[in-house]
């Protein structure tokens, strides 16, 4: 005799549903937003089929780092096209590897990276990304002013080595900094690294790494260190934190990519103002 009830495991209620409530998070009436619950449900959905973790995330980051270290020795970066391509290629390769890993050993990019499935989800994620991107940009400008006021630097601009690039390549670089780099970096940091840490739950060793706030802080710090720009470290940590909030609230790299793009708006536009 077949027991009545849903046969699809995804339709079953949470394991704690039949128990007395132990804390407020078990209730949708506690004031958490719909985006919060969607992020929670996406995280739970990912864990079932996710067979990649910290080693896979480390491989993606290692490929990115190896590309940035090796390409200057392999191509002539004094050439404008080669220089621009040298900036793009390592991140494109790393993001491509991330997509391969999620397709072969995970649930696929749509689930593992929380890609929106409906227009309403797209809208919600874009709105969250714009809001937190604006916070990242405003806070970053304030921190930069405070840091530069107390720091004696000969070259305070990370764009100084871009002077002399012809306009067509500047436009290509603007598009990369504004859209391409945010997408690739979010796949690496708030996609792979975030997902690898997020799946560490009890009884796994070092399950504390799966705490959402630990994940947020770790990804923000690694993101800042990865850019290797000393005086901008605090600016980048704040940016990573604000961008990560967009990821945490929505469960999607679309929101964090949008926030990252908003945060990169001024640097992208600044490139066009550089003398040829």
Task: Write out the residue ranges for each language-model feature.
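N-terminal, membrane-interfacial amphipathic/helix-forming hydrophobic leader that caps
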Residues: 1-125, 141, 145, 179, ...
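Intrinsically disordered regions, especially transient/low-confidence alpha-helical propensity segments
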Residues: 13, 19, 25, 29, ...
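Residue-level signature of transmembrane alpha-helical entry/exit and packing/kink sites
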Residues: 49-57, 80-88, 121-129, 169-174, ...
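Alpha-helical transmembrane spans of integral membrane proteins, capturing the lipid-embedded, hydrophobic core
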Residues: 57, 61, 65, 88, ...
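Juxtamembrane helix-loop-helix connectors linking adjacent transmembrane helices
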Residues: 75-86, 110-181, 199, 203-204
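Basic, gly/Ser/Thr/Pro-rich low-complexity segments located predominantly at protein N termini
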Residues: 100-103, 111-112, 119, 134, ...
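Transmembrane helix-loop-helix hairpins at the membrane interface
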Residues: 165-276
């Amino acid at each position: 005799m077949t027991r009545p009830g849903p046969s699809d495991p995804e339709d079953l209620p949470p394991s704690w549903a039949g128990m007395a409530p132990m804390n407020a998070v078990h209730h949708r009436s506690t004031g958490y937003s719909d985006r919060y619950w969607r992020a929670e449900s996406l995280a739970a959905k990912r864990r079932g089929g996710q067979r990649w973790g910290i080693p896979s995330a480390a491989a993606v980051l290692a490929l990115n780092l190896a590309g940035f270290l090796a390409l200057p020795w392999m191509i002539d970066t004094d050439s404008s096209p080669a220089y621009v391509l040298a900036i793009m290629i390592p991140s494109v390769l790393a993001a491509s590897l991330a997509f391969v890993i999620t397709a072969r050993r995970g649930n696929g990019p749509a689930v593992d990276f929380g890609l929106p499935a409906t227009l309403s989800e797209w809208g919600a994620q874009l709105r969250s990304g714009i809001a937190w991107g604006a916070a990242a940009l405003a806070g970053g400008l304030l921190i930069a002013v405070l840091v530069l006021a107390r720091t004696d630097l000969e070259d305070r601009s990370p764009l100084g080595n871009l002077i002399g690039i012809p306009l067509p390549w500047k436009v290509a670089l603007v598009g990369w900094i504004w859209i391409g780099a945010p997408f690739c970096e979010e796949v690496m940091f708030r996609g792979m690294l975030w997902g690898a840490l997020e799946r560490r739950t009890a009884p796994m060793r070092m399950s504390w790494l799966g705490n959402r706030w630990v994940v947020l802080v770790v990804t923000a710090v690694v993101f800042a260190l990865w850019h290797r720009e000393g005086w901008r470290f605090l600016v980048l940590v704040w940016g990573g934190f604000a961008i990560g909030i967009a990821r945490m609230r929505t469960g999607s790299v679309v929101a964090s990519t949008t926030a990252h793009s908003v945060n990169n708006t001024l640097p992208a536009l600044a490139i066009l103002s550089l003398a040829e």
